[in-house]
A protein has these predicted regions:
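Transmembrane core module of solute transporters
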Residues: 30-94, 99-102, 113, 117, ...
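C-terminal membrane-cytosol helix-exit motif in multi-pass small-molecule transporters
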Residues: 196-214, 231-241, 260-274, 510-517
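Cytosolic juxtamembrane N-terminal segment immediately preceding the first transmembrane helix
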Residues: 2-42, 46
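Small-residue (Gly/Pro/Ala) motifs that create kinks and tight helix-helix packing interfaces
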Residues: 57, 170-182, 432, 436-440
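Hydrophobic transmembrane architecture of multi-pass small-molecule transporters
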Residues: 11-21, 25, 70, 200, ...
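Transmembrane alpha-helical cores of Major Facilitator Superfamily
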Residues: 44, 76-80, 107, 161-165, ...
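Helix-loop-helix hairpins in multi-pass membrane proteins, especially solute transporters
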Residues: 86-225, 252, 411
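Short helix-capping/hinge motifs at transmembrane helix termini and TM-loop junctions
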Residues: 120, 152, 208-211, 244-245, ...
Length: 535
């Protein structure tokens, strides 16, 4: 009876149809291991690509004969397209099936990566990055869904742990790998490396999951909802990516983008909540656990990712680190994250996920507090210690929050829920990065002004330093050197302000997570029931 009105309504609301086929049993033995590796590899490749190009922008821009400012469209174009298609995962899954959609997305991601490497102009590269971002959207939510379906209910926490491990480590590894490839080879190779990796991931995924397809339904296309989604998300992402460059709301372009985004978002909410077949299931937010879980995850990830972006910027611009060296400072975060994430997955079967999240946020707060004591004389060992400790928090916050957001959900709604959750996470990361980089500049200007009140011509310290420098430099260069020292101190103090604020936010988030009421009837706090139903 596919295609009936009742089934279409079920598809739109996320409810399971009355005559749903029996769920697939969990995978066993080698099949589960191979399937998990294949899915994790695809996720790692996808998430890595969101950050690997960041440190290569100067090289790409120079090779294509454009400015670094124009080169940032390589990042913006991917982010906009990706943000639009991620929340469409639930609807696309109902049309094409989980396995088919995941394989199509992975193979198209490989193709567009190859095209990006062959691009000979900025215009061509931006077009291919738009296509790459668009096809990448469903990969992360569906990898989570398929991973959950591979494990028995009592091991759902472990499934989430394996998935989260690759999702969190990849953004940290991206700048390190991107810098190394750009320095050692040429920038197209940051895209070419996806080809063999993606093909292997797709082939093994097909071998393991080809007979585990989810049911499909011929539901109508919500054209108005799709159009409004494209407009408000696209305008928002461009505004966030270009806001600092255009001086935010002093620019008519940013003001226009903000107005368009807000108006389109309001109409999108109204339309999707009244449409019989919405393209995005906003009714998921009627669930307390989903709302609190997604909100907490979004805020925490926004602060976490903003700090991930800020550290390399500070190290490269004001501490004299190369891109590769800055990557080595941030890379150790993956040490404890990789080792402890499986442990957290096992703990989730017996512990209240809110306790694990609270522990993670307190560790994040400790790390931020430690960083707030940095200075320009800090050696690499001093910088690395908080990074290593942060890996403990990474292992303990992402998996339990995902379990909370899925707790109590009908299995048929998991793809849509995962898509919305990941959309909120990615958008929060963009918000956090834009807000943090803007605050960094603003607070640096404040500190520079305060420092200049002390270090100015006529003050003993300034005059002494100036006379010393004049022995080897002309007056203009001596003044420029002193101003450079003030800038370094000002931006360092500004970074410390942000680290301190991050610590406060993480402490406050410990209260927010306790507003959730995860179902404790299942082996993993209710998340296992939702996850296990995805089989």
């Amino acid at each position: 009876m596919s295609g009936t009105t009742a089934e279409r309504q079920d598809a739109a609301t996320g409810a399971a149809p009355a005559a749903a086929p029996a769920p697939h049993p969990p995978l066993e033995g080698a099949a589960r291991i191979i399937g998990s590796i294949a899915l994790s590899t695809a996720v790692f490749m996808n998430v890595l690509d969101t950050s690997i190009a960041n440190v290569s922008i100067p090289t790409i821009a120079g090779d294509l004969g454009v400015s670094s400012s124009q080169g940032t469209w390589v990042i913006t174009s991917f982010g906009v397209a990706n943000a639009i298609t991620v929340p469409l995962t639930g609807w696309l899954t109902q049309r094409f099936g989980q396995v088919r959609l995941f394989l199509m997305s992975t193979l198209l991601f490989v193709l567009t990566s190859w095209l990006c490497g062959f691009a000979s102009s900025l215009e061509a590269l931006v077009v291919f990055r738009v296509l790459q971002g668009a096809v990448a959207g469903p990969m992360i939510p569906l990898s989570q869904t398929l991973m959950l379906a591979s494990f028995p209910r009592e091991k759902s926490g472990m499934a989430l742990a394996i998935w989260a491990m690759t999702t969190l480590v990849a953004p940290v590894a991206g700048p390190l790998l991107g810098g190394w490839i750009s320095d050692t080879y040429t920038w197209p190779w940051i895209f070419y490396i996806n080809v063999p990796v993606g093909l292997l991931a797709a082939w093994f995924s097909w071998r393991i999951y080809k007979d585990r397809e989810s049911p499909t339904r011929h539901i109508p296309i919500d054209r108005m909802g799709l159009a409004l989604l494209v407009v408000w998300v696209g305008a928002l992402q461009v505004m966030l990516d270009k806001g600092q460059e255009l001086d935010w709301f002093s620019s008519p372009v940013i003001v226009t983008l903000a107005v368009v985004s807000v108006v389109a978002f309001v109409f999108f909410l109204i339309w999707e909540l009244t449409e019989a077949h919405p393209i995005v299931d906003l009714r998921l937010f009627l669930g307390r656990n989903f709302t609190i879980g997604v909100l907490t995850l979004a805020v925490a990830y926004g602060v976490f990712f903003a700090n991930v972006v800020l550290m390399p910027l500070w190290l490269q611009r004001f501490m004299g680190y190369t891109a590769t060296d800055a990557g080595w400072v941030t890379a150790p975060v993956g040490l404890f994250a990789i080792l402890l994430t499986p442990v957290v997955g096992r703990l989730l079967a017996s512990q209240d996920p809110r306790r694990l999240v609270t522990f993670a946020f307190l560790v994040f707060a400790l790390v931020s507090y430690m960083r707030s004591g940095f200075n320009t004389q800090a050696d690499m060992a001093t910088l690395i210690v908080p990074t290593v400790i942060q890996g403990i928090a990474m292992a303990a916050f992402f998996v339990p929050l995902t379990a909370i957001s899925l707790s109590g959900l009908d299995p048929a709604r998991i793809p849509a829920a995962s898509g919305l959750s990941n959309f909120a996470r990615l958008t929060a990361g963009a918000f956090g990065t834009s807000i943090t980089t803007t605050l960094w500049d603003d607070r640096a200007a404040f500190h520079h002004a305060r420092l200049s009140e002390v270090a100015h011509p006529g003050s003993p310290g300034f005059d002494s330093a100036f006379e010393t420098l004049r022995q080897t430099l002309d007056p203009a260069r001596a003044l420029s050197y002193i101003d450079g020292l003030l800038n370094t101190q000002a931006f360092t103090l500004s970074a410390l302000d942000i680290f301190h604020a991050s610590a406060v936010i993480f402490v406050l988030l410990t209260a927010l997570v306790w507003l959730a009421r995860p179902n404790r009837s299942g082996p993993a706090g209710g998340a296992a029931e939702a996850a296990g139903g995805a089989h």
